[in-house]
Regions:
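Short gly/ser/thr-rich secondary-structure transition/capping motifs
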Residues: 27-33, 57-60, 133-140, 190-196
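A short, aliphatic-rich alpha-helical micro-motif
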Residues: 39-43, 68-71, 148, 200-205
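Phosphate/diphosphate ligand-binding glycine-rich loop within oxidoreductases
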Residues: 45-130
């Protein structure tokens, strides 16, 4: 029976519930504060789910050569995010272990947050809030904000998150999009109606 092991907690517990309800899959949660029991479970694991954030994972659970020497049955490692800082991909590849990540899983949330911060700066929301809490009582004209409407927005990166920011700014605020991303195809720039530029020009504008 395939055995999936995950460390501590997962943000999407509904995913764990789905797997646990499959009678042909064994799902085991291990605790980072119980090394002996954890590695006993990992020794017979076929898949390991681990956070992508280095500061959230004790080094002993980083998937490197030392870790892999203790997990001989492993065939898949899954990173709980777009990154994979806790996984030595080269070491896994040498052993024929598949590494997967969750690219795009939080793109919508991050994109909306980025646009929210733009609006916060343009409308001076946080700045005004802090001063009001300190007793400021000046004229409202002192804090006139600016609109995002029809502004030119510069994006460094036009992947899952950057692309979604572009869509929100265009569809919601009629913005023009400048973008720098040397790894994205011209077709994607066209699809997102973004003007391709270099980093210096983007920062200048």
């Amino acid at each position: 029976m395939p055995k999936i092991v995950y460390l501590d907690n997962l943000p999407a517990q509904e995913g764990v519930s789905i797997l646990e309800n499959q009678n042909k899959i064994k799902v085991v949660k291990i605790e980072s504060n119980n090394l002996e029991q954890s590695f006993k479970e990992l020794e017979t694991a076929h898949a390991f789910q681990v956070s992508a954030a280095r500061d959230e994972v004790p080094k002993i659970f980083h998937v490197n050569e030392e870790f892999l020497s203790k997990t001989p049955n492993l065939i898949l490692v899954s990173s709980g995010g777009a990154g994979y800082d806790t996984i030595d991909v080269e070491a896994c590849t040498k052993r024929g272990i598949l590494v997967v990540n969750q690219t795009g899983g939080n793109a919508e949330a991050v994109a909306e947050h980025a646009v929210a911060l733009m609006l916060d700066l343009l409308k001076r929301v946080t700045e005004t809030d802090l001063l009001l809490r300190k007793g400021w009582s000046g004229a409202r004209e002192d804090f006139i904000g600016r609109n995002l409407f029809k502004k030119t927005v510069g994006l460094i990166g036009l992947g899952n998150t950057g692309g979604r920011v572009a869509e929100i700014c265009q569809n919601g605020f009629s913005c023009d999009i400048l973008a720098y991303d040397p790894y994205i195809s011209n077709e994607r720039f066209s699809k997102l109606n973004a003007k391709k530029t270099n980093l210096d020009e983007l920062l200048f504008k």
